[in-house]
Amino acid sequence: MNTLTLALRGLTRNHRRSIVTLLAIAFGFAAISLFAGYTHNIYSGLARQSIHGELLGHLTLSKRGMSTAGKLDPQRYLLTLDEVARIEAALQHEPQITLIAPRLAFSGLVTNGRASTIFIAEGISPQAMDRLQENMLTEQEARSGMYDRLAKKLDPARESGVALSAGLVELLHLHVGGEAILLVNTLSGQANAMDVTVDGSFNTGNAGTNDKFAFVPLALAQSLLDAEGRADRLTLLLEDVTQTEAIRDRLLAKLSAAGFDLEIATWQELSSFYRQVHGMFNMIFGFIFSIVLAVVLMSVANSVGMTVIERTREIGTLRAIGLKRSGVIRLFATETLLLTLLGCGVGFLLTVGVRYGINGSHIAYTPPNGANAVPLLVDMDYPRILLTMVLMLAVGMLAAFLPSFRSARQHIIDALGHV
Amino acid sequence: MSLSHPRVSVPTQRPASTLLQLREVGRRFMLGETPIDALHAIRFDIHAGEFLAVWGPSGSGKSTLMNLIGLIDAPTTGEIYFDGHCTGDLSDDELTAFRGKNIGFIFQGFNLMPVLSALENVMLPLHIRGVGGREARTRATAALQDVGLAKFIHSRPDKLSGGQRQRVAIARALVVEPRLVIADEPTANLDSHNSLMIIDMMREMNRARGVTFVFTTHDPRLLAHVDRKVLLQDGCIERDESTP
């Protein structure tokens, strides 16, 4: 028999109270873990959507000032064919970089011959587009079929083939295989128009852009803008998303040493939507976390407080037969630790069960500003589950400390005389 | 409790070594703003191997005296010496360790842990002292055998009779091989048959092992079994008699 056994037996003394406290911990733990799992799924989904769905890649490399002054004077900040080639050469031995894709963004009018509307387009090579969209969906998401229209495709064999967002196709009564005309200003300010074929349509996933976005082959974009061989930025795809920041810093130093005055933005910096959603969910998570921890704190404090009162004579007896004050605190701390651990264990099982139920029930919802429904999925966010457990243990110990400290300080004869 | 009561202290003359010395020990409690003197300048020695009963009417200060002798309470005035060492100099942790090693307790209400078996209850003081599991189990089993409860080692207290529970408590008190056992009204919750059995058992342990026993009682019949009886009245020793 040791302190652990004694603590375990102590928990069985008033098993109803122990079970109620355990369930409070378990439900709190499960609530936090499930919400953490849900937000994890949202974060990873948004990250994949930003990197692969919106074709941001992991890093975007452009001339310094392109994102500010370059908006008004793009010609001055575009990368030349020679610069693109030199940068690609400088980066070709970077093992973490799996793709370097020159891009050229532009806007203009698109018409079906009877009506016109504005569009925003990205010029990119069809091969790079395919590479960037790899790993966009998880197996589960792909199976759900809800994301089928998110894929963007350009035919590398067709120089004038474009992909238009679904809203744009609908707005202009176009159809896949049909013709449209793109009208833009060249870099020098001349009007330029070109017939294109609608090779495909896609859903941007965002109601704000789904009626104006287009992808065109890079060569077509360069031809439209009269910007032969030029690009406004290079999109880099990395092997490991967690290395994004570190590689950005390394590349910046390397390219700067090679004489380039460039800026490199991470996908997180470019995706304000991701940052906003991340910030909002973190705030909600913190709020829920605080409430649950407060409930756990009060439950454990109440439970230990009642236990201490109930077992005052027992504490007196233990003290009389040689248990030191620290031993009394250790005993109740061990009981609380066990109760909290068991609560977290039951909470974990609840999390697994409820998650299985949610993920298997194919619940779908349309997120704010979303263009289509998405499945409600919950991940297992193990780092935050572990953090929740550690914090719950800490809170439990904190809640147990004061009543057990008081009981340990009590005079033995008062404790023995307690009725 | 009268403050003017005459204080009588009768030191006993015995060949055995002195285990415990109380020197002008007083104990005052505060009842709100009112001070209550439970013991008045007690001067009193306990010798190793004695089987001693403290008796007297309710409120005479018996339990207070036992608490002081058992070192679970501290005197307001005076000093208590255990084996010649002043216990007032010890810190709480030192005193607790000292108690765990030298003093066994038998309580009126048995004070057994209800969630532990008889064996585990007896192992408890050994566990507190850091004795290993196997050795603690062996010693606790032997202690329970000594009090005739070999068949009940796995029984929880609620499955035992009052007499059996008190025997478990005796085993728990003796398992650490203490030098002194304090028993505050050990027979108060028992019938006369069990009371005599418990006293006989304590007496036997006293004779066989030389452990010093000090207990309080209301029951005058039990006084016939002791070799020294101290009458306490109004916080003072009224009479200290040795039985030949």
Which residues does each predicted region cover?
Chain B
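ABC-family P-loop ATPase nucleotide-binding domain
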Residues: 1-28, 239-244
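ABC family nucleotide-binding domain
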Residues: 19-225, 229-232
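H-loop (His-switch) and adjacent beta-strand-loop-beta switch element
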Residues: 229-241
